[in-house]
From Swiss-Prot:
The gene is purL. Signal peptide: none annotated. Mg(2+) 1 binds at residues 78, 512. It catalyses: N(2)-formyl-N(1)-(5-phospho-beta-D-ribosyl)glycinamide + L-glutamine + ATP + H2O = 2-formamido-N(1)-(5-O-phospho-beta-D-ribosyl)acetamidine + L-glutamate + ADP + phosphate + H(+). Its main location: cytoplasm. Its EC number is 6.3.5.3. This is Phosphoribosylformylglycinamidine synthase subunit PurL. Part of the phosphoribosylformylglycinamidine synthase complex involved in the purines biosynthetic pathway. Catalyzes the ATP-dependent conversion of formylglycinamide ribonucleotide (FGAR) and glutamine to yield formylglycinamidine ribonucleotide (FGAM) and glutamate. The FGAM synthase complex is composed of three subunits. PurQ produces an ammonia molecule by converting glutamine to glutamate. PurL transfers the ammonia molecule to FGAR to form FGAM in an ATP-dependent manner. One of its GO terms (cellular component) is cytoplasm. GO terms for molecular function: ATP binding; magnesium ion binding; phosphoribosylformylglycinamidine synthase activity.
Length: 714
């Protein structure tokens, strides 16, 4: 139970009485951090949420933007961190199920999944166990429901050892005239519950997600983890689309965190309406369930449709066709109250808005001590450094992960996992580039800069594909907001993200906040996972691999002496410290704008584009060479910027940088740009040369591939 003394005082004042046990349970889940966003709501208001392409912004199950004249892109992101720490296979699978239902409830067909995963170092046996079973849970669920997992990211750090992070993004497509909403606007309409039966799994799941984990959580909190069923989910998807095609439903919403209590109260509260719910009508999986268990159950694969009574039989016939339990469980009223009945007796009577719109909490924020300067280290030989970096699990190939996913199903995937972003076909000429990114180390050491840089990196990844960002979604993973230092991190991170989004005039249309990611006093690195969707023409797609020999290699953007918080320091020196790279909002925007203009205006003369992030320029060029099998000769001293030595030139993670290759003269193509750029080398041969240091492509390939496979075979 999480209701505080002040919350109970507020509730008593609103009701004029004490809540009964069922009402207390309903209020408890709705006042949880997971459902109410009571700590984060005042801060989330910093995000820009409006734009000319925005159809539905934050506040519904997912955000919606126009992507063509006829179609809308529906996109959302969710976390399933606590359940995945307790039961990794089931927790990850039900995370997939939840975000799929969010997209379906907007009327959209899910077309892509992306995942952002964080675990402890793979030397740790428990971390390997969690990693293996989370990936298997994602792949089994996604593959069985027929939705491709097309991109993602994985990070390993000791601060995720006890508390992994499992974030999942989903995108869907829907004709603009067929978009649905999570509302119940018409009194007299009824609630049709369909899908999986209601059982005892997941009770108090949202309360569990709003508390720190402990050493006993794995045993004590296992009942709070929901049980997924991908086969039923597939049937629910098919039946849902048939119902929405054939019946004029006035509202649709999935049952996720908070179960029936959350779903129905939110449906009616948005329209200042009320609800009357009859418990005996609800299809149950288990005998003897109490009203408390029924109203708080988070059993999976359930949907609520709001419709006129005359349409019920047609909907029931569709459910029978798919052999799915379904029942009318109540009706929309004009009272503004949520009333629960059992055997004709009223057992709960609460204002719907009290449930759906709890008061916010003003948290104390206090700045912790942060690094102000750079870390001085002795630099090892360049060749050894690069080989160690690209064989780090944080940089090495993630094919062990994505080869378990079906990324081809639905045949929309144009650019597959392993590039800067995935590209999906929307129609014959239009594509959408999708990515998720985060830099938890930068955010830990500079929350404002790390938040801004995470948005910047995600935007760079879609721009590198030839797209321009149309919307942002976010999943904000932090520790206990009751701790002033944690809440300061959160506030500053959101401020940085909002400033970068505002600079690009790109709206944040949906998101999720996951607090209390702490176990036994260890707080996860603050992790602002950013999803970006970009629109592009299918005939202008760029990929990161070198295409031919004799092409000029260009760097756009400046490199500074910024090894602080870098993957170089973490991997080579075992140091997580130092001031992260500066974030120049204007420079980030101008570089992205320049790259997009070059791609669009140069015909096919730009042959490859890659964003520069973890590991710096050396790693980015190595990845381009490894993927193509073509070598390159680089002169580090030609890199534009201010650096003191070759290691700073090659491994600094300065923001706002791109690497591209061009056919012909770079000066002819880039000469008019008003951003820093320089030709730093040419492609060719079977070695990668940085000055007088040369590495065979085969040696780089061996170091880059098979790293995670080797860990997971132990």
């Amino acid at each position: 139970m999480v209701l505080t003394d002040s919350e109970m005082e507020f509730i008593r004042k609103e009701l004029g009485r004490d809540p009964n046990p069922l009402e207390y349970g309903m209020l408890d889940v709705m006042f949880s951090e997971h459902c109410s966003y009571k700590s984060s709501r005042p801060v989330l208001g910093l995000f820009p949420t409006e734009g000319e392409d925005v159809i539905i912004g934050p506040g519904d199950d997912a955000g919606v933007v126009e992507i063509t004249d006829e179609l809308a892109l529906v996109i959302g992101i969710e976390s399933h961190n606590h359940p995945s720490a307790i039961e990794p296979y089931g927790g990850a699978g039900t995370g997939i199920g939840g975000i799929l239902r969010d997209i379906i409830s907007m009327g959209a067909m899910p077309v892509a999944l992306l995942d952002s995963l964080r675990f402890g170092y793979l030397e740790d046996q428990k971390s390997r166990y969690l990693f293996e079973h989370v990936v298997r849970g994602i792949s089994d669920y996604g593959n069985r429901v027929g939705v491709p997992t097309v991109a993602g990211e994985v990070e390993f750090d000791e601060n995720f050892q006890l508390n992994p992070l499992v974030n999942v993004m989903c995108a869907g497509l829907v004709p603009k005239n067929d978009i649905k909403r999570g509302i119940a606007p018409r009194p007299g309409d009824v609630f049709l519950l369909m899908g999986g039966r209601t059982g005892r799994d997941g009770i108090h799941g949202v309360t569990f997600a709003s508390e720190e984990l402990t050493s006993s959580s794995e045993l004590e909190d296992r009942p709070a983890v929901q049980v997924g069923d991908p086969f039923t989910k597939k049937m629910v998807m098919e039946a849902s689309f048939e119902i929405m095609d054939e019946i004029e439903v006035s509202g649709v919403k999935d049952l996720g965190g908070g179960g029936l209590t959350c779903c129905i109260s939110e449906l009616v509260a948005k329209c200042d309406n009320g609800a009357r719910v009859s418990l005996e009508a609800i299809p149950l999986r288990e005998e003897g369930m109490t009203p408390y268990e029924i109203m708080l159950s988070e059993s999976q694969e359930r949907m609520i449709f709001v419709m006129a009574p005359d349409d019920v039989e047609a909907a029931m016939e569709i459910c029978r066709k798919y052999e799915l339990p379904a029942a009318v469980i109540g009706e929309v009223t004009d009272t503004g109250r949520m009333i629960v009945e059992s055997e004709g007796e009223v057992i709960a009577d609460l204002p719907a808005k009290l449930l759906a719109d709890p008061p916010v909490v003003e948290r104390e924020a206090r700045k912790p001590q942060l690094p102000e300067g750079q870390v001085e280290v002795k630099h090892p030989p360049l060749k050894d450094t690069l080989l160690k970096l690209i064989s780090s699990p944080n940089i090495a190939s993630k094919r062990w992960v994505y080869r378990q996913y079906d990324h081809e199903v639905q045949i929309r995937t144009v650019v597959k996992p392993g590039d800067d972003a995935a590209v999906l076909r929307v129609d014959g000429t239009t594509g959408v580039a999708l990515t998720v990114d985060c830099n938890s180390i930068h955010t830990k050491l500079d929350p404002y800069g790390g938040g801004a840089a995470s948005v910047g990196e995600a935007i760079r990844n879609v721009v590198s594909m030839g797209a321009w960002p149309v919307c942002i979604v976010d999943c904000l993973n932090f520790g206990n907001p009751e701790k002033p230092e944690v809440f300061w991190q959160f506030r500053e991170c959101v401020r940085g993200m909002a400033d970068m989004a505002e600079t690009f005039s790109t709206p944040v249309i949906s998101g999720n906040v996951s607090f209390y990611n702490e176990t036994e006093g260890v707080t996860v690195n603050p992790s602002p996972v950013v999803g970006v969707a970009g629109k592009l023409s299918l005939d202008s797609i760029k990929t990161l691999d070198f295409k031919d020999e004799g092409e000029e290699i260009v760097v756009i953007g400046e490199t500074g002496p910024e090894l602080g918080a870098s993957e170089y320091l973490r991997t080579v020196h075992g140091i997580v410290d130092g001031k992260p790279p500066e974030t120049d909002l204007k420079a980030e925007f101008e570089a992205a704008k320049a790259v997009k203009e070059i791609i669009d205006g140069s015909g096919n003369k730009v042959t490859a584009v890659h964003d520069c992030s973890a590991g710096g320029i050396a790693v980015a060029v190595a990845e381009m060479a490894i993927k193509s099998g073509i070598g390159a000769r680089i002169d580090p001293m030609k890199i534009p910027g201010r650096f003191r030595n070759i290691h700073e030139a090659l491994f600094s993670e300065s923001n706002g940088r791109y690497i591209m290759t061009v056919r012909g003269s770079a000066r002819d193509i880039l000469g008019g740009l008003d951003v820093p750029w320089a030709v730093i080398g040419t492609t060719g041969g079977r070695t990668l040369e940085f000055g007088d240091v040369a590495l065979d492509i085969s040696e780089l390939d061996d170091a880059y591939h098979g790293v995670i496979e080797a860990y997971m075979s132990t």
